Design a protein with these regions (language model features):
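General detector of N-terminal leader/presequence modules that precede the first folded domain
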Residues: 1-15, 360
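Generic structural signal for secondary-structure transition and capping sites
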Residues: 43-47, 96, 212
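Rieske [2Fe-2S] iron-sulfur-binding domain
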Residues: 55-177
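C-terminal catalytic domain of Rieske-type non-heme iron oxygenases
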Residues: 83, 89, 149, 154-418
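Non-catalytic accessory segments flanking enzyme active sites
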Residues: 26-70, 74-75
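Short, contiguous pre-domain boundary segments
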Residues: 9-25, 184
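Short linear motifs in intrinsically disordered
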Residues: 51-58, 136-138, 302-306, 340
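Short Pro/Gly-enriched beta-strand edge/turn motifs at strand-loop
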Residues: 45-51, 57-58, 127-131, 307-311
């Protein structure tokens, strides 16, 4: 047993990845000027993951999203031909938002200001009192398109008028590793949202390492991700994948809820290594869990994986399915956080009970994390400390900062990806 656990933590990943081992400045968490550079150099040039295409399964389905970091409101819709398209949700007349609902189905979109009407392919088809306009041509006044691509069911957009690289080039080795994953229950998300008084990276950091779990989450999931053999929750695996990164977290295979915790003991899933991250025994999970990218070490002591899709999304895998974390910056010190948990429909009362237990525990853990990052942001803003000191199991945070530094300084996206 000790020989197996001795190999849990990747050794020298920081050095092998060519990363510095020195302190990391906190300036990017608190500087309005650095945030302005991130807006232009990162978020306006990178491919941004918005969600799953299952959110708009039918022709005419649409969703709208605020992308505050780019001062944009985006309309994503599915055409009659089944293609996913994206547009700036801005009327060609005088700039009003055309669609005010967060989601729905429509063959046409009518701006509420003056009833200018657009088909869901973006073309302008109706203008009241059109003859009173001067030298007017509807063909030149459609909704402004946004580059959009779907990869493995994930919808990405690029807000640059002409993206400098394709989505496939942007994803790089991440796309190779994650290709072909059969995502279970991708059309059934449970959504958790919160506006947080913290820089987006401060929140993201909390999900890029497991070092804090035995301490911060001692009363919730601490003993799920740590054990006497692995008291500091060392990782099973860590990989730097171009601009992106993977962490695979240890799970205590001998975890059992305390006798006093009768609710969790009642719902405990004895078929998984980490009961609080497992919520179903759906057969669809079998092929998902067998995929090489899910639990890549195929360890029996596994809790979850976290794939960080640069810059702002984590896709997490666990024994019971998958979930995402989105970190949308709203200012240099505020973030709109969104989590989506994809769980299969419960086949039994016991499975439904475990799902409810999973969500309630997830909310508990999120509250611990989000309260802590707000305190962390205040600490950084005090400027009492100018640097962070990161250890080996925080390598993903270091890699994120290295990647951001390249993007902020690079004159082209291809240079940033090199």
């Amino acid at each position: 047993m000790n020989e197996q656990l001795f190999k849990l933590s990747p050794s020298n990943v920081t050095v092998e990845a060519g990363l510095s081992t020195g302190p990391v400045s906190v300036e990017s968490y608190i500087s309005p000027e650095h945030y302005a550079r991130e807006k232009e150099q990162v978020f306006r040039r990178a491919w941004l993951l918005l969600g799953r295409e299952e959110e708009i399964p039918n022709a005419g389905d649409f969703v709208t999203r605020d992308i505050d970091v780019c001062d944009a409101n985006v309309l994503i819709t599915r055409s009659k031909g089944g293609h996913v398209r994206a547009f700036h949700n801005v009327c060609s007349h005088r700039g009003s938002h055309v669609v005010l609902k967060p989601s729905g189905n429509a063959g046409k979109f009518v701006c509420p200001y003056h009833n200018w009407t657009y088909k869901n392919d973006g073309s302008l088809v109706g203008v009241p009192d059109e003859s009173s306009f001067f030298n007017f041509d509807k063909k030149n006044c459609g909704l402004t398109p946004i580059a959009a691509e779907v990869w493995e069911g994930w919808v990405f957009i690029n807000l640059s008028p002409e993206p400098q690289v394709s989505l496939r080039e942007f994803l790089g080795p991440l796309a190779d590793l994650m290709a072909g994953i059969p995502y279970p229950a991708a059309g059934h998300p449970i959504v958790i949202q919160a506006d947080i008084d913290a820089n987006w990276k401060a929140i993201c950091d909390a999900f890029l390492e497991t070092y804090h779990i035995p301490m911060l989450h001692a009363e919730t999931i601490g003993t799920t991700y740590a054990s006497p053999e692995n008291p500091f929750a060392h990782m099973l695996d860590a990989r730097m994948l171009g601009a992106h990164r993977l962490l695979s977290a240890y799970g205590n295979a001998n975890y059992a809820a305390k006798p006093s915790n009768k609710v969790e003991r009642l719902g405990q899933d004895t078929h998984s290594t980490a009961s609080v991250t497992s919520c179903s025994n759906d057969p669809a999970l079998v092929s998902f869990l067998e995929h090489p990218a899910v639990n890549p070490t195929k360890s029996t002591s596994w809790a979850q994986d976290a794939y960080h899709v640069f810059p702002h999304v984590l896709i997490d895998f666990g024994p019971g399915g998958f979930w995402t974390h989105n970190f949308w910056p709203t200012s240099h010190k505020t973030t709109r956080y969104e989590s989506r948990c994809y769980v299969p429909p419960a086949a039994t009362v016991a499975e439904r009970f475990r799902q409810e237990l999973f969500i309630s525990r997830a909310v508990e853990v999120l509250l611990e994390d989000l309260a802590n990052v707000a305190r962390t942001q205040k600490g950084m803003q005090s400027r009492a400390k100018g640097f962070m000191y990161l250890q080996e199991n925080e390598v993903a945070i270091r890699h994120l900062h290295s990647t951001l530094d390249k993007w902020v300084k690079a004159s082209t996206v291809r240079e940033a990806l090199a």
